[in-house]
């Protein structure tokens, strides 16, 4: 039934204009033929007959037929008496359609939850189309606020699809004008907000206005989920400082997330194929995989093209590593200007060397020397991040090795489908980064990741309370600061993609029960904890991977350990090597918290 309804809807959307034009022509033909047949017996003069026929046809379209209902009329005239007013009504309604839809859409924000989108441009319209079709059978309500009025040919299809379009001075209006506009939007009914102007400074200006409005008129249902487009990251320091100022519980009425198309593409890449798939495959088919804890090999990532997308892939891969204990993520960058770009990346992220090993291959990707330059690299994963689809495909074809190759096909849906269906040199390649799959509520507002993170946080708190703090109530998700939420999202993604599948291969149910039963006794006894880890190498390996992932996350956010500047506000005493962590009795006790994720999602 749903397929038939969709087929009829598509047919009407495609042929609506032609069907209405055909109906108008049929009505005009009936009006002329019927009027001619009706007046020809009564009028002998030819010129007068033509004039009367034309005038009668016009009157039929204006709801004023010349003949009465009781008068005998030809069949064509009788049909025209009903068909012509119908065509006139359709034409009048289409002229008023934009105004009527806008008024009804504006009224519906009082009664239905909606998603607010502030922005302009093709990417913004793609996101709006994805949002309005994301509500299942009933389309989700979307309100689009633009800086300047949209052309009718763009606005009318949106409003026909259930999107209400407003042109409001949220960016450059006076404070009074912004207040009036925000009160008209009734943000207490909003389910989320997306600030998606190409100019990032406008997004930040709207963010401050929305925050001030919600502080004055607070919502009853908690913080408003808000996604802020950050573009190329030029304003990232300002946005990071803003988030640090509002880290405290209840400090901001907004649950702020930052996004860019490059970061969304990187997340999409590793959602399609996990970074640690090669490491997990090494344990398949083994009779006793728990005895192969020393055979795990670190991931070796090749990034072709170190632009905004390549940088985002590097950071996302670092968040999903390590895949082997005591080994940094090994990244090789292939670009014509690799040395200069790597120097810029290292200056931008000064702690990057603590969790990533970087190498540069500076050469033309279309060079005949490319296979020789990459020979023996031992890569386990490759990401081709060039913006030009043809260059990306040629680079993927030139790569040699039995490892997955993600090919960025930005805006090339047809090429992406062909790549999915092709074999030969592209049998190991898969597409990522298509705009239609990126600009969705699940990725932009992070609903899918947040659902997984909230479930992970609830399970983690329940285990922590049961094992260590029975009298302490768990901390709710909304009470966490922005850094802790980001940390939980990263932890949930890593556990779901790598740590839990690895645990299921390494640990039996009996070993898991031993860990669960012994953990509560080890919290205050470092010696017992060391004994547990030495007796069960698989448990020690999983705890070490989680500790090193956690260290990498804090290093990426500017934190320093004992070997750094301890006067820095971003200091944590447990940011140390695994062996050093175990040697110190106080820091060794924190390994218990690295073991809690292993107990979640029992096999």
Question: How would you describe each model-predicted region?
Answer:
Residues 557-565, 586:
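C-terminal amphipathic alpha-helical interaction region
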Residues 567-602:
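Amphipathic alpha-helical binding modules
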Residues 2-32, 41-55, 63-544, 577-579, ...:
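Cytosolic regulatory regions of ion transport systems
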């Amino acid at each position: 039934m749903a397929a038939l309804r969709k087929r009829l809807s598509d047919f009407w959307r495609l042929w609506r204009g032609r069907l209405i034009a055909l109906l108008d022509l049929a009505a005009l033909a009936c009006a002329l033929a019927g009027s001619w047949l009706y007046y020809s017996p009564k009028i002998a003069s030819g010129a007068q007959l033509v004039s009367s026929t034309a005038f009668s046809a016009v009157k039929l379209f204006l709801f004023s037929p010349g003949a009465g209902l009781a008068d005998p009329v030809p069949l064509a005239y009788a049909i025209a008496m009903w068909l012509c007013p119908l065509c006139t009504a359709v034409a009048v309604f289409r002229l008023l359609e934009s105004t009527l839809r806008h008024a009804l859409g504006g009224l519906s924000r009082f009664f239905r939850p909606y998603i607010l989108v502030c922005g302009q441009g093709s990417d913004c319209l793609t996101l709006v189309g994805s949002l309005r079709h994301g509500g299942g059978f009933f389309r989700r309500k979307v309100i689009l606020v633009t800086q300047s009025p949209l052309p009718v040919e763009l606005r009318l299809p949106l409003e026909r699809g259930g999107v209400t379009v407003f042109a409001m001075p949220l960016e450059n209006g006076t404070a009074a004008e912004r207040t009036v506009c925000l009160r008209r939007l009734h943000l207490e009914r909003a389910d989320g907000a997306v600030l998606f102007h190409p100019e990032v400074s406008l997004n930040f200006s709207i963010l401050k206005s929305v925050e001030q409005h919600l502080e004055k008129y607070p919502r009853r249902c908690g913080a408003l989920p808000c996604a802020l487009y950050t573009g190329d990251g030029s304003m990232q320091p300002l946005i990071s400082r803003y988030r640090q100022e509002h880290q405290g519980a209840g400090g901001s009425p907004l649950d702020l997330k930052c996004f860019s198309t490059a970061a969304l593409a990187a997340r999409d890449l590793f959602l399609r194929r996990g970074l640690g798939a090669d490491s997990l495959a090494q344990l398949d088919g083994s009779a006793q995989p728990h005895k192969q804890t020393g055979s795990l090999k670190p991931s070796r990532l090749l990034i072709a093209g170190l632009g905004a997308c390549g940088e985002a892939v590097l950071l996302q891969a670092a968040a999903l590593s390590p895949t082997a204990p005591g080994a940094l993520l090994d990244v090789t960058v292939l670009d014509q200007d690799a040395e200069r770009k790597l120097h810029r990346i290292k200056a931008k992220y000064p702690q990057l060397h603590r969790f990533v090993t970087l190498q540069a291959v500076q050469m033309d990707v279309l060079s005949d020397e490319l296979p020789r330059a990459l020979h023996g690299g031992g890569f386990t994963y490759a990401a081709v991040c060039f913006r030009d689809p043809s260059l990306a495909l040629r680079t993927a074809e030139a790569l040699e090795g039995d490892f997955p190759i993600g090919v960025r096909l930005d805006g090339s849906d047809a090429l992406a489908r062909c790549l999915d269906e092709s074999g030969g040199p592209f049998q190991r390649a898969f597409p990522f980064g298509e705009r239609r799959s990126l600009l969705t509520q699940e990725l932009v507002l992070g609903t899918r990741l947040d659902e997984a993170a909230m479930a992970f946080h609830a399970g983690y708190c329940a285990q922590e309370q049961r094992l260590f703090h029975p009298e302490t109530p768990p901390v709710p998700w909304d009470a966490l600061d922005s850094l802790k939420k980001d940390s939980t999202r990263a932890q949930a993604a890593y556990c779901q993609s790598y740590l839990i599948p690895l645990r299921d291969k390494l640990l039996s149910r009996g070993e898991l029960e031993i860990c669960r039963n012994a953990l509560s006794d080890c919290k205050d006894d470092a010696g017992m904890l060391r004994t547990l880890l030495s007796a069960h190498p698989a448990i020690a390996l999983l705890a070490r991977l989680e500790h090193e992932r956690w260290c990498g996350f804090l290093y990426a956010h500017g934190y320093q350990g004992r070997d750094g500047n301890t006067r820095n506000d971003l200091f944590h005493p447990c940011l140390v090597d695994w062996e050093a962590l175990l040697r110190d009795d106080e820091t060794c006790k924190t390994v218990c918290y690295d073991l809690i994720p292993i107990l979640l999602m029992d096999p």
